[in-house]
Amino acid sequence: GAGKQYFSIWKRKTEKPISLSLPHVASRAGEVVEILKEFPELEDPKTGRSLMERTIIICNTSSMPVAAREASCYTAVTLAEYYRQMGLNVLLLADSTSRWAQAMREMSGRLEEIPGEEAFPAYLESTIASFYERAGKVRLKNGKIASVTIGGTVSPAGGNFEEPVTQATLKVVGAFHGLSRERSDARKYPAIHPMDSWSKYDGVVDMTRVEEARSILHRGNEINQMMKVVGEEGTSAEDYIIYQKGELLDSVYLQQNSFDPIDAACSPDRQREEFGILYDALMASYDLDDKNEIRGFFNQLRREFLDWHGTEFESPEFYAQEKKISEFYKSKAVE
C-alpha cells in the first residue's frame, strides 16, 4: 500500500531506454486489465507518441498455471537480452519478484524437493542472483554499448524485510528503494524512505556533498524523534534549525510531483544546479533564535524552492527564482 505500482508506472514514463520489458507475475486479474487499458493511453514524454510503442508487457495472473507464473521473469529477461544484442538500452521492471518466488515454492513442493526457509526452495538465493546478474552493459561487435537494467519489486508479507525473498534480493542488487507506508500516509511522494534506502552507484552530484546532506537528514530525524518526547519547548534553537534543515531537504529534494510535466523528471544538469543551491542553504548558519521565526523562515524557503521546481530549466524565470532563493536565505545567514 506504499505505491509500488504507481512508482513503477512513473519510472516507465520518465526513463530513457529504447525498449521496456514488463513482466507481471501473479498479478490480480483486475490489476492486469487496468494496465492493459491504461498503457495504450499513456503518452511517452520524450516522443509524444504512445508509450506502448516501446513497451512489451508479459502478464500472468495469480489464477494461471504455476509453470507460466514461474516462466514470466525468464521470458522477459530473454526478450530484454535480445533487444540489448540489437544495440538498445532496455529497462526491465519485474512486478513482483515475491510472487515469482512463491511460484517457485509451489513448483518445488510439487517436485517434493527438500524445502529451505519458509518452505522456499533451497536454491532460492542462487536463482534470484542468476536473474539479476543477467543485467548489465555489453560492448557489441560494432563497438556500440547496449544495456539491460533490471528493477524488481518485492512485496514482503507484513512489511517484514527479514523474509527470505527480500534478504536474497538485497544481497545481489546494487540499489534499494525502500517504500514506506508511513511516508505514503504523510503524502510524501515518491514514498521512498531516505533512511532505509541505499545505492552502491555514484550519483550525478558530488558524493561528498551528498554524504554531508545525508548527515543533516539523519540528525534532523533524531531531533524529530526527541521532539516527540520533550516537545518543541525542550529543544534548543540550534537543534530546531537542524530539524528544519532536514525537513527542507526532504520536502524540496527527495519529493517530486509526478503530475507536473517539469517536476516529474529532472535532467542531471538541473539536479546538480538545484542541489548546489540547496547545499549552500543547508550548510549556512542562521541568526535566528525564536522558534516561530525559524519555522516561518524555513516554510518560506520551502515555498520558494517548490516554485523553482515548476520553472523550465535555463529559462529567465528559472534564473530569476534561483537569484530570489539565494538572496532570501543569505539575508538571514551569518558568516
Feature roles, as predicted:
Residues 1-304, 314-318:
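P-loop NTPase catalytic core
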